[in-house]
Amino acid sequence: MKKLTALLLVLAMLVTLAACTKKDEKKEPKDSTAPIETKAPAQLVDAPVLNINEIYGLSPEGQKATLANTLSLTDEDKAAVKEGNYKVAICMHQMDNDVNVMKVNTIKKILGDLGVEIIAVTDGQSSVEQMTTNLETVIAMNPNAIISIAYDVNAMVGIFEKVRDAGIKLVFFECAPTGFVSGQDYYALVSTDYYGSGRFAAEYMAYLLNYEGTVAMVYYDADVWTCNERDDAFRKVMDKYPNIKIVSEQGFADVSQAGTCADAILAQYPDVDGIYATWDVPAEEVMASASAVGRNDLIITTVDLGDNAARVIAEDGMIKAVGAARSYEDGEAIAYATVYSLLDKELTDRYVATPTQGVARENVLDAYANCYQVNPSDMIIEIWEAVYGTWTSPLA
């Protein structure tokens, strides 16, 4: 009977491991476009800076960034775009998260106020095939410009070549297709500094661990530049600290697998101190897995600030910190870059980036308001105020 029980336990663990795309191994950082930090500070006694004002990463082409807040429109620009009767389409890869919804709403508001007609907003539903179909439909509508993302930088080259060859201006956010050259094949690439986001998630975890312990990664196993950048930044930061070891990396191809990957890590390393996840939704799956085995003391850091992550941070749950996209500023920069393209306005550096917003419990309400330009829900505010006292919104 004991032998049978032991055999069943082994089989259960093997099934859990098989669900993840990577086994217990450390993935070597890719050749990131960002500078490599190779030396740990001699002493770190303060928490990492939350209000970050610099860009750490480079574009996929190795370009330095134009800060998004330097883009502006003159009165003459505004008048010209209103007189142009321009039509723009927005082709998204996914619309199931707060970050992308905010981007789209901001773009629509700014362009709409300038008299630009938004003729389509499409949802690719995290599918290259669906995005391709959407783009083909939009090309037939003959817009002046398309705002989109190369959700798969290789598989979507063909469809974006069709957009380019149709004479439609292209403004990308986050990812451009492989081989496309800024200023020639597309006008500009606008992105959050995702290298900076992964860097912050790593630095804050290291700080909470007092720079020693074991960590693991639940990462998105796909060729997506924005995800690869943050994951590689996490690895490189951890490599600086000799007393911190990444003991396991488990990759998922679909968010629904993230919990299974966390299960595998916790089965192999039940005492692991922290787990990083590529963004907040899989981080929630990691949290559920940890809770199921009584690991409520697990430290989780991630990227992106959805409402659930904000609530967990406010109540001092397992998610302790995130490197967040300044979604309103991202949307604003995308809209302005699109106007630049419509007017053939000069843009010296074609990579436009917004700095990461560092988020921890102490500043989660301010950070949320800064990222989205709306206040968090009353529930999140009440949770935070129970500890810190009355909050005054920076938007008031």
Summary of predicted features, one role per range:
Residues 4-22:
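Sec-dependent N-terminal signal peptides of Gram-positive bacterial secreted proteins and lipoproteins
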